[in-house]
Amino acid sequence: MEDKFDLSSARLVVVKIGSTLVLDRETSGIRSSWLESLTEDVSRLLTRGQQVVLVSSGAVAIGSTIVDRLATYSQVSHKQAAAALGQVQLTHAYSESLKRHGLQVAQLLMGRGDLVDPAHRLNTRAVLLRLIDLGAVPLVNENDTTATCGTRVGDNDRLAAWIAEIINADLLILLSNVDGLFMKDPRNNPLTPMLTEVESITREIEAMATQSVDPYSSGGMISKIEAGKIAMNAGCRMIIANGTRSHPLYAIESGGPSTHFIPVARDRV
């Protein structure tokens, strides 16, 4: 039986934006008009009483255009430098776009400890909820500038899922460059069917996931499946949807293609 879901019913929404959505590959700049459409969607949700946290990738991708990227991209120091340079531009772009809707952005850069250490988790929760109460829009990213192997989260899909768990969000939206979860890789199998709902992450579901081939992306569908496990176990619905077109949140609400991960029923606090 198909699960009916109204996005407007979600009180607290975490939206993760992939780097491929933020970066214009032709100009090596930020997709400003697309970002404006996203922040317009965010403003609409806030106006009707919902709360929104943004988790955005893109700092490394943007910064790498400054440090003359791919030849040495895999070297940690170059990636860290790119993150430092790109984060400034990324935050500024969000700030300017949200400001046009009368909204204030608040930047948070996090490491693994902020999400898994009990004391740090409590602090992360308190800060995020306080910013939301103040009417700000939290903009979260991993702190790639200082992260090491032992402190890295690894990808923003799981980071967003942990954020959703920590603040007890009702909905996690992963905006990507694909419509949802397909039974096979649609790049090689264009006619493969897409799942509209996932009620349990089985071995068969895990086998459908592929790793990202994009040099700027950390996870691909594998990390999204892992994010789904975190969200579903926390009682949070997760949606994977294509965010490449304008007004991606409105597109979901209008019935655009997406895959819904149905959460495990549990008491929310």
From Swiss-Prot:
Positions bound to ATP: K16, S218, G219, G220, M221, I222, S223, K224
CDD domains: AAK_G5K_ProB
Stored PROSITE patterns: GLUTAMATE_5_KINASE
InterPro entries from the UniProt entry: AceGlu_kinase-like_sf, Asp/Glu/Uridylate_kinase, G5K_ProB, Glu/AcGlu_kinase, Glu_5kinase, Glu_5kinase/COase_Synthase, Glutamate_5-kinase_CS
An annotated GO BP: L-proline biosynthetic process
Binding site for substrate: S57, D144, N156
Family to which this protein belongs: Belongs to the glutamate 5-kinase family.
NCBIfam families, A to Z: proB
Localization: Cytoplasm
Protein name per Swiss-Prot or TrEMBL: Glutamate 5-kinase 2
Broadest EC class assigned to this enzyme: transferase
Pathway(s) it belongs to: Amino-acid biosynthesis; L-proline biosynthesis; L-glutamate 5-semialdehyde from L-glutamate: step 1/2
Coiled-coil spans in chain: none
Catalytic function, reaction form: L-glutamate + ATP = L-glutamyl 5-phosphate + ADP
Cellular component terms per the entry's GO annotation: cytosol
Function comment: Catalyzes the transfer of a phosphate group to glutamate to form L-glutamate 5-phosphate.
Predominant place of localization: cytoplasm
Keywords assigned by UniProt, alphabetized: Amino-acid biosynthesis, ATP-binding, Cytoplasm, Kinase, Nucleotide-binding, Proline biosynthesis, Transferase
EC id: 2.7.2.11
GO MF: ATP binding; glutamate 5-kinase activity
Any Pfam family matching the protein: AA_kinase
Recorded superkingdom: Bacteria
Keyword rRNA-binding in annotation: no
